[in-house]
UniProtKB/Swiss-Prot annotation:
Belongs to the MnmG family. This is tRNA uridine 5-carboxymethylaminomethyl modification enzyme MnmG. NCBIfam families: mnmG_gidA. GO terms for cellular component: cytosol. NAD(+) binds at residues 273-287. One of its GO terms (molecular function) is flavin adenine dinucleotide binding. Its main location: cytoplasm. PANTHER family: GLUCOSE INHIBITED DIVISION PROTEIN A (PTHR11806), PROTEIN MTO1 HOMOLOG, MITOCHONDRIAL (PTHR11806:SF0). It is found in: Cytoplasm. The gene is mnmG.
Amino acid sequence: MQYHEQFDVIVVGGGHAGTEAATAAARMGLNTLLLTHNIDTLGHMSCNPAIGGIGKGHLVKEVDALGGIMARAIDLGGIQFRTLNSSKGPAVRATRAQADRLLYKAVVRQMLENYPNLKIFQQACDDLIMDGDRVAGVVTQSGIRISGKTVVLTVGTFLNGLIHIGMENYKGGRAGDPPSIALAQRLRELPLRIDRLKTGTPPRIDARSVDLSVMQAQYGDDPRPVFSFIGDASQHPRQVPCYVTHTNERTHEVIRNNLDRSPMYAGVIEGIGPRYCPSIEDKITRFADKTAHQIFVEPEGLTTHELYPNGISTSLPFDVQVQIVRSVRGFENAHITRPGYAIEYDFFDPRDLKANMESKCIPNLFFAGQINGTTGYEEAAAQGLLAGLNAGLRAQEKDAWHPRRDQAYIGVMMDDLSTLGTREPYRMFTSRAEYRLLLREDNADLRLTGIGRELGLVDDERWGKFNAKMEQVEQERQRMRSTWIHPQHPSLEAVNALVNTPLTREQSLEELLRRPEVTYDALMAIEGVGPALPDTAAADQVEIQIKYAGYIERQHDEVEKQLRNENTLLPLDMNYRDVNGLSNEVIAKLNDAKPQTIGQASRISGITPAAISILLVHLKKHGLLRKTA
């Protein structure tokens, strides 16, 4: 049966990658279809009810700067907001929000249902329509054939998903949802490298059976940070605290005594789990000297009693889970509402992708999210937006776009994945970026909103607010440069009280603000110096740009040097055995990874500077020197 309409972009999957992919393509004015096995689970948080964190918050801000929906959704569905690393430099400060799981999902669904150019259809995808070697649409579980110029796969953990609780296991995409078996089998027939990964989740607990009074309360920040550049704290719903408790020796003893019943330690689970979100079994084994591990007790929402005990993800049998939970202070009488579990699933080697998320061997097919070996809502959302954008560009026969490593954490992530691949679930950290000072949360809009506007991702409302902010920043920076404080200034005494070294000569406000002990707010509070900008985001931008100007300029110089050969293209069909002077090891690694540029090749483990020089000579000799735009 043929569907009655053809689409520019078909997105398979309605999780965090799928919703961003579909809305990105739709914002570009393209006829877009979001195919989901269940409309009621659009934007569902399968694991912890939170958005953001170190590195992750940066990704959310970048998605927002490009017009994405995640930041706006969490502003409307977040029940606790905090800035992490607030005492550290601006490069590593990160926003995190606790979410009301149901409210967040409802907000996402409402956004999608009202999105122009976007249609939603509830059907599982079982097959791809091929036109020669390229994708031309999908086939649903009921045999409906839907034609599309491009297809984006954002299927999460559903491909051959296998859920484990103790020695028992059953097929599932996540708890309560069926797996995608037919599509997984179809994809295994294609020339793609495939492997297995695993992730897990803790048991959920009824708050009415818990004694929160013996735990440490953890409140949000005041004033509250806002995720979206066009958001406002007044949009936030009622705020609630989280709580902190700990495992203890009794907990650890229960786990050690039952490791033989763990599917991970019994060899039943083959997939590798996330390094930075290990199960409680892993923690006890890998950190045997630790007598306690933190558990963050997170409310699931404002209208439910369920709690999420972040830190005790487990796949041990249910009876052991009960013992583990009840050994913890405050949980002695806890009632588990849902058992914890581990899930194994198929993923595809992201080295088979171009940096724009398109398959190297199957034109018009794009991958985003956990199918690429990543973990986390934020990583999925960022990939989804990039895949949806490039699927839209491909549908219009326009050039692809992806950010460089110095432009965005999205660029860092996709370069890591497409160049190096991953053997374990990939998670974003600020430490993965070599140009952290350029890739701050606060300047994500400065870096990306202009580009997003050119690509058709940024609407008039966002563009107007962005330009108004930029005008404020530029005018204030000009005022700071041209306003001088001299030794006879009437407010000299107040200025000297602010600085470590009293003024002996005339200094501009900009020079004063460069001093480490001076803040913008304190300087503006001095009579005759202000007023401060009413927009705190613009004021923060002024302060950061002035205080860190030297460091920022130095990083820009480093980027300029690095870019000289970074964008030199390498032909995808190049046989490195034809390049004289390369070692067999280098040839094997280059033929395996098939890097798109000299920059990507240089970041492959074992590729030496000498090998890069040989490649450049070969390209020049054969007239192959080309650079990306």
